[in-house]
Structure formats: structure tokens, C-alpha cells
Amino acid sequence: MAPVSGAVRVLDTAAGRFRVELAGGHVIVARRVLAATGLVDRLPDIEGLARHWGVDVIHCPFCHGFEVRDRRVVQIVTDPIGLHPALLFRQLTDRLTLVLDGVEPGHPELDVLRGAGVDVVEGPVRRIVSGEHGGVAAVDLEDGTSIAADAIVVTARFEVRAAPFASLGLVPTPLQSGLGDHVETDPSGAT
């Protein structure tokens, strides 16, 4: 069978089969459909942040830690779950600053981080400042404080793009971590 491509207009089930109607007029009938639409990263709403996402604005010490080792890293914590990677980033650089933007300063983890030499600053972030070569240069706070940075860490929320599959009952449910949504599956990956 030759490959067929096109945007899905209608997706329904009948007699144990899936019927997929494509925008170009093709109709495909199949026993299984692989729902692979990906996720959308929802970033904190901070001026200048999105333009650096995936380059100088990162989220994971395992994915990006090697590239930011020994650099000035500012971690913007907008939710308590964002405290989790801080100790891991601290192992990669002794120039880590945590900015608590909307997170209570009394978290027990903060004492551990301060004891490990992490600077902790409280206050809302105003914007991310770009340097002359286009990379991140600083994090500006609402109170006028400017913190020099070579890289910024944030916690992104995951949004499942499940709308095309809603007619089949595939709807996103919240992750237990609070980091976004997912489509529940059984241990074999079936929905």
C-alpha cells in the first residue's frame, strides 16, 4: 500500500475498526490507530523567556546539565515542584541562584539549598534580558534587581494535544506531579 498523508478530518469507530477520513478525501480503515500528537511546553509567562527556550532556557539537569556546568545559572521557581532539580544543578555549578517567584520562602528544601551554597532571592521576575550576541544575559526582577545569567532553568508544564482524538474518548487527565496532563494508558500503552 502506498503511503497516504493528510490532516485528519473525521476519526470514528465502527464494528471494532477505526475509520479515518483525511482532508484530501482519502478514507482509511484500520484495526489500530497510533495517537502520537506530542506535547506543548507551557512556559511561565515572563517577557523574553520563550525566545530562549531550548537554548539558554532549559528545564532538566540530565538533558542540559553538561552544557551549563560551571556557568551562571538562574533557576526561576514558580511552583514548589520546581525546587526538585535545584540540588542537581548545584552539583554542576557553584554559581546557582534560585529566584522564588510566587513560591513561599519557608520550604524546608530551601535550607538544604542554602546550606549547599545556593543563593536564594525572592520576588517576581519582570523579564529575561538578552545579551549583545543574542543569548541570555540577565534576569530582571520587578524590584529592579538584575541577576547575571548564562542559562536559566524553569519548570515547563506539559499540554497534551489530544483534541483530534476526543471523539474516541481520549481526553487529557492531570499528572499527579501537577506538571501538566497526559492521556492514560494501560501497562501495554493501549488506551
What are these regions (language model features)?
Residues 4-17, 122-134:
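A conserved short coil-to-beta-strand element within the FAD-binding core of flavoproteins
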Residues 81-128:
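Rossmann-like dinucleotide-binding cores of NAD(P)H-dependent redox enzymes
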Residues 2-4, 58, 119-121:
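General small-molecule cofactor/ligand-binding pocket signal
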Residues 39-86:
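Glycine-rich dinucleotide-binding loop and its adjacent helix/turn
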Residues 27-40, 149-157:
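Short hydrophobic core segments
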Residues 23-25, 142-144:
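Glycine-centered tight beta-turn/hairpin loop motif at sheet-sheet or coil-to-beta transitions
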Residues 51-67, 158-191:
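FAD-site-proximal beta/loop scaffold in flavoenzymes
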